[in-house]
């Protein structure tokens, strides 16, 4: 009688929240780069160099960018953004739906409304 032993190995992804948090940290510390063109034997070559040499140069594991993100606070027909003017925000939230962030620090108007809704309550 023979016995077999089977081993199965797999790599499990971390939960989605930790991946998002990691990417957000990378995004917040991304390095701005400048495109430089120079002539070499094979023709014109574009290379990236850090825009601010006082900061440490990015590693292979850092995020970099060479174009600024559009400003989503203001309307922009090129990007299709309507801006955040007249959006409803959450006064008590410190997240992305919070008034300070969503209104881009421009302040906000507070409106109180009373509504009557049928709730189909059973007592």
UniProtKB/Swiss-Prot annotation:
Gene3D superfamilies: 3.30.2460.20. The keyword Flavoprotein does not apply. It is found in: Secreted, Extracellular space, Extracellular matrix; Secreted. InterPro entries: Wnt, Wnt_C. Keywords: Developmental protein, Disulfide bond, Extracellular matrix, Glycoprotein, Lipoprotein, Secreted, Wnt signaling pathway. A lipid is attached at residue 1 (O-palmitoleoyl serine). One of its GO terms (molecular function) is cytokine activity. Disulfide bonds join 89-104. It holds the Pfam family wnt. It comes from the Eukaryota. Palmitoleoylation is required for efficient binding to frizzled receptors. Depalmitoleoylation leads to Wnt signaling pathway inhibition. Glycans are attached at residue 90. One of its GO terms (cellular component) is extracellular space. GO terms for biological process: canonical Wnt signaling pathway; cell fate commitment; neuron differentiation. PANTHER family: PROTEIN WNT, WNT RELATED. Ligand for members of the frizzled family of seven transmembrane receptors. Functions in the canonical Wnt signaling pathway that results in activation of transcription factors of the TCF/LEF family. Required for normal embryonic development. Belongs to the Wnt family. This is Protein Wnt-3.
């Amino acid at each position: 009688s023979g016995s077999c032993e089977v081993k199965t190995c797999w790599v499990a992804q971390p939960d989605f929240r930790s991946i998002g948090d990691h990417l957000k940290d990378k995004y917040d510390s991304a390095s701005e780069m400048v495109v430089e063109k120079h002539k070499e034997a094979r023709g014109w070559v574009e290379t990236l160099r850090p825009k601010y040499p006082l900061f440490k140069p990015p590693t292979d594991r850092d995020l970099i960018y060479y174009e600024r993100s559009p400003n989503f606070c203001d309307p922009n027909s090129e990007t299709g953004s309507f801006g955040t003017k007249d959006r409803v925000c959450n006064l008590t939230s410190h997240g992305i739906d919070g008034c300070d962030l969503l209104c881009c620090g421009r302040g906000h108007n507070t409106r109180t409304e009373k509504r009557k809704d049928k709730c189909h309550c059973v007592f």
